[in-house]
Amino acid sequence: MKQFIDFIPLLLFFIVYKTEPRAVDILGNSYTFGGIFSATAMLIISSVVVYGILYIKQRKLEKSQWLTLVACLVFGSLTLAFHSETFLKWKAPVVNWLFAVAFAGSHFIGDRPLIQRIMGHALTLPAAIWTRLNIAWIIFFLFCGAANLYVAFTYQEFWVDFKVFGSLGMTLIFLVGQGIYLSRHLHDTTPNTPKSED
């Protein structure tokens, strides 16, 4: 459910981006609705609204949601301020790479890999499996960041389509693969305490 909520601002961004640009009169002022810049404004506004509602209901946001929101505000604001979509193109790569750094850092900070801290309450797995799973997420985030960067600056005509649906597709494929991998170890009741690699 959380993933679908996080997807709402991106979906609204996509809808506005695909809308044929046209002039809209608001309080006597003329604005252009449709295209990359009004879509960016929609992304910022909808992100603040969605995560604001989540914060009010839950009294907190997950660290990943804070990172997504801050990145949206920073890169979105720079895009509008300098009237250049280049800043927005860097948002997905930077966010993905920061996630990769966080997952990688958890191997050296704390007693458990980050993926175990996230999913450990629901699954009991050997420490070696948690380590492999965490490394898989690091590789996934690095790949997603590189793929987003490559498409954004090489295939500009459909980088928004890839940003919205390509990233979602890669995530779903990865999650299916993760599920298949985990299904082989779900009956292993070895305590999930950290241990050194052989």
From Swiss-Prot:
Membrane topology listed for this record: Multi-pass membrane protein
Pfam family, one: IspA
Keyword Disulfide bond: no
Signal peptide segment: none
GO cellular component assignments: plasma membrane
Keywords: Cell inner membrane, Cell membrane, Membrane, Transmembrane, Transmembrane helix
Main location: membrane
Protein location: Cell inner membrane
Stretches that traverse the bilayer: 36-56, 67-87, 90-110, 133-153, 162-182
Family: Belongs to the YciB family.
Classification via NCBIfam families: ispZ (TIGR00997), PRK00259.1-3 (NF001325), PRK00259.1-5 (NF001327)
Function field: Plays a role in cell envelope biogenesis, maintenance of cell envelope integrity and membrane homeostasis.
Matching HAMAP family: YciB
Record-given protein name: Inner membrane-spanning protein YciB
